[in-house]
UniProtKB/Swiss-Prot annotation:
Residues 67-81, 126-141 have a biased composition (Low complexity). GO terms for biological process: DNA recombination; DNA repair; DNA replication. It is found in: Nucleus. GO terms for molecular function: 5'-flap endonuclease activity. Residues 16-186, 235-255, 590-654 are annotated as: Disordered. It comes from Talaromyces stipitatus (strain ATCC 10500 / CBS 375.48 / QM 6759 / NRRL 1006). Keywords: DNA damage, DNA recombination, DNA repair, Nucleus, Phosphoprotein. This is Structure-specific endonuclease subunit slx4.
Length: 800
């Protein structure tokens, strides 16, 4: 029974052939007209034996390929011969062709098979088993039917030779019939390949594709349309809502994809048409403005663009608030107005001539952002500045007047005083002329009244301050001025007292008690005002050698220590006390000191240093004259404290600050500066050098009085002599002693190299050597040398 599993029945898949048109095959019975050998039907074998013999026969005689016509003819002939005339095969086998030995041995087997399968008709087509399945089938059949095979073998051996010939012929005919059956069109091998490629699903019920109604034989009555509905999109089950139009009414570029349903589409057609109409309206109203080209001119003029009307900017809010169709039609009206406005030129660009004209009409402001920035009230800043300037002018009224009349007023200035400020110097018109600052009368301003009230409070304390100032003047003169000089200076002091007015009398009365206490205490002299030779003499007087003490600073420190050890600390305490009190009322003392310096210096003789025997006496007297110049006004201030000019005068409440000279920054002076210098020199009648701070450098005041006795013609002669002396100087040799007046370079070479000229050294060289080369017998001071340097743009400075 296992052999049945190796055979499969295949449902016919290929179309049936039309046998009426096929050619009938030529068989021996048809060719020779022989009757069939036996008419009696053979006995039917068992089904297991039938399939076993068919498998063995197929293994021995494989089918050979033939042409389609011959195969078709053979198939029809063999089928007829097998079914209708089974007896003819026996007779034909007797007269068969002589075959080989292999055909004779296999003839008896095939004959029996053909007889057994004569009347069997299969409803389907039998597929050929593979070689493996055939081997299994033969092994199973041999094990089960051994008895049948043995019986067959016994019968075969007992058969006679005539019977063997018949069997051979029958087997040959059967083999030909099988070959025709294989080529008949079953194509079993190809059918197996098709089946392996695709196997249809099991059909539970036959469904007619053409009809929509379900078949009667199926249990579940489903049509083909019902089956496809399971795969169809069902709108009822979907939870998506219909697409709502956007708030603006514009259809988006990306639209939702939906399956088309005819019923839903018909319902949506009027809605979509309405939305399209609304979208067209909104597109017309909401047309985007065209992008303009971004140019440099557009960027510059954008900040001056006129802002449009605000009504056009809020059109969108009105549309969103309106819900009816009437509201949507209203905003179209202002759009027409804006379209008309856009035609006008947005930017009005001026021509080059008009642009330059507008620039010329503008007022330029100079200064930093902090200076140009103002508070909420524009008058507050101006009133504050005016009040400060007024208070300074009241405090430094006399000081400012002397600074403007002095010859050196252009080089040294204070921080708070001066007629011209920094911005007034820089203000110029289009022609290059200096613009004079505006003068504003702020006397009625409340801020000025507050400042004046404060100044009145300060004036009440003036007697006390003046009494402290007088103590310093008395103590300074007692230590430095001899008695003979004091008596000689009294007439000059009286002249100054008469012109000073009522203020010096008040200070004189208040300074009485302090005069006696200060005169009793010895005061330490100011060694910083001594010259190098004077310092050396003082050091030698205390018994020190000059080799051990070198340098100006070391000598001053040594002299201070020696004086303190000799006189004690009481004098130093008095100096500190008087110096602190002198800082209160400096303005009166400074102005009086300048007048006394200029008037006393006219009466003093001069002496020069020793260079030649012929000039011995004038030079010796000049040294004494220098000392008397600084001491005589001090003696006058001992009796009249208004004209105080003590050597260590500290800074006042408004410190005098030495600024950097303009000659150091600009080697070649500007034309305006030269013009101002000429005007100041022409106006000058008594060129006093009194604007220097006397407390820091008293040596400057000692040497500055040289130019007080010179008029304009004398100044020009001395300046030409200075120029001649510089050109006549030869290169000096370096001395072994290391004196300060033996530089390696000449003064002319230093000037060419822009090296700062030390005024003290240059003046000393002119008085000792320079004027001798130029045949000049007079001497010059530091102030005149400084004026000469600044007029020629030479960098000069005082000794540090």
């Amino acid at each position: 029974m296992t052999s049945r599993l190796d055979h499969t029945i295949v449902i016919p898949s290929s179309p049936e052939q039309n046998w009426a048109r096929s050619v009938s095959p030529c068989t021996p019975t048809r060719l020779f007209g022989l009757p069939p050998m036996s008419i009696s039907p053979p006995s039917l074998p068992s089904p297991s034996r039938l399939f076993e013999e068919i498998g063995l026969g197929q293994q021995k005689n494989p089918p050979s390929p033939k042409s389609p016509f011959s195969s078709a003819a053979g198939k029809t002939a063999t089928s007829k011969a097998i079914t209708e005339n089974p007896s003819r095969n026996e007779s034909s086998s007797k007269r068969g062709r002589p075959g080989s030995s292999e055909a004779k041995t296999a003839g008896s087997r095939k004959n029996s098979k053909s007889q057994e399968t004569r009347n069997k008709i299969l409803t389907g087509r039998v597929a050929k088993p593979t070689t493996v399945s055939k081997a299994k089938a033969t092994a199973a059949s041999k094990s089960k039917d051994t008895s049948v095979v043995k019986a067959k073998a016994g019968t075969k051996k007992s058969k006679p030779a005539s019977q063997n010939k018949k069997d051979k012929l029958a087997e040959e005919a059967e083999a030909e019939a099988k070959e025709v059956a294989d080529a008949e069109g079953l194509n079993l091998e190809e059918a197996l390949k098709r089946r392996s490629d695709w196997t249809p699903p099991k059909a539970l019920s036959l469904v007619s594709i053409d009809e929509d109604t379900p078949s009667q034989g199926s249990g579940t009555k489903l049509s083909f349309g019902d089956v496809l509905r399971d795969y169809h999109y069902n709108r009822e089950n979907s939870s998506c809502e219909p697409a709502q139009p956007s708030k603006e009414g514009n259809p988006t570029k990306r639209r939702r994809l939906e399956l088309v349903e005819f019923e839903v589409l018909q319902e949506r057609k009027p809605i979509q048409q309405k939305q399209i109409k609304d979208a067209v309206k909104t597109r017309k109203t909401k047309s985007k403005p065209k992008k303009q080209l971004n140019t440099i001119t557009a960027r510059v003029t954008a900040r001056y663009e006129q802002i449009g009307e605000l009504e056009d900017l809020f059109v969108y809010n009105e549309e969103s608030s309106c819900e009816t169709s009437e509201c949507l039609k209203k905003p179209t009206k202002p759009k027409k107005e804006t379209a008309g406005k856009q035609k006008e030129p947005e930017y009005i660009i001026l021509s080059p001539d008009a642009a330059t004209k507008s620039l010329n009409d503008q007022n330029f402001l100079f200064g930093t952002c902090s200076q140009l920035e103002r508070d909420d009230s524009p008058t507050f800043f101006e009133e504050t500045q005016t009040a400060i300037q007024l208070s300074e002018c009241l405090t430094f009224k006399k000081t400012a007047s002397t600074i403007t009349t002095a010859s050196s007023a252009m080089s040294i200035a204070t921080r708070f005083t001066g007629k011209k400020s920094h911005w007034s110097e820089a203000a110029r018109d289009f022609n290059g002329a200096v613009v004079q600052p505006e003068i504003i009368d702020m006397t009625d301003s409340p801020t000025v009244s507050v400042a004046l009230s404060r100044l009145s409070e300060v004036k009440h304390d003036a007697p006390k301050m003046a009494s402290l100032v007088s103590s310093q003047s008395v103590s300074a003169t007692n230590s430095l001025v001899p008695k003979d000089v004091v008596t000689a200076s009294k007439p000059a002091a009286d002249v100054q007292l008469a012109s000073s007015g009522p203020e010096p009398n008040k200070t004189e009365l208040a300074a009485g008690p302090f005069r006696k206490t200060a005169s009793r205490l010895p005061e330490m002299p100011n060694f910083n005002g001594y010259t190098d030779s004077e310092l050396k003499n003082q050091v030698l007087s205390y018994g020190f050698s000059l080799r051990a003490v070198r340098g100006r600073k070391k000598m001053i420190e040594l002299l201070d220590k020696c004086w303190q050890s000799k006189h004690g600390n009481t004098a130093t305490a008095a100096i500190v006390e008087t110096s602190s009190s002198a800082a209160i009322n400096e303005t009166v003392s400074v102005s009086a000191a300048r007048h006394s310096d200029t008037q006393v210096s006219d009466k003093l003789p001069t002496r020069k240093k020793k260079t030649t025997p012929s000039r011995l006496e004038p030079k010796t007297t000049s040294r004494a004259g220098k000392k008397k110049v600084s001491e005589k006004p001090l003696a006058g201030k001992a009796d009249k404290p208004v004209e105080k000019a003590a050597s260590p005068i500290p800074a006042s409440t408004y410190n005098m600050v030495d600024e950097i000279e303009d000659s150091e920054e600009e080697i070649i002076p500007s034309p305006t500066r030269i013009q101002i210098q000429r005007q100041s020199s022409s106006r000058q009648t008594t060129p006093a050098i009194s604007c220097l701070p006397l407390g820091t450098k008293s040596k400057r005041s000692l040497k500055s009085t040289k130019s007080s006795t010179y008029d304009e013609a004398t100044l020009l002669e001395l300046q030409s002599s200075i120029t001649k002396a510089i050109h006549l100087q030869t290169r000096p040799r370096r001395s072994l002693g290391g004196s300060s007046y033996s530089p390696q370079l000449t003064w002319h070479e230093k000037i060419l190299l822009y090296e700062p000229i030390i005024l003290e050294d240059f003046a000393a060289w002119l008085n000792t050597e320079g004027f001798a080369l130029a045949c000049e017998d007079r001497e010059v001071g530091v102030a005149l040398v400084r004026t000469w340097c600044e007029s020629r743009g030479i960098c000069c400075t005082f000794r540090p």
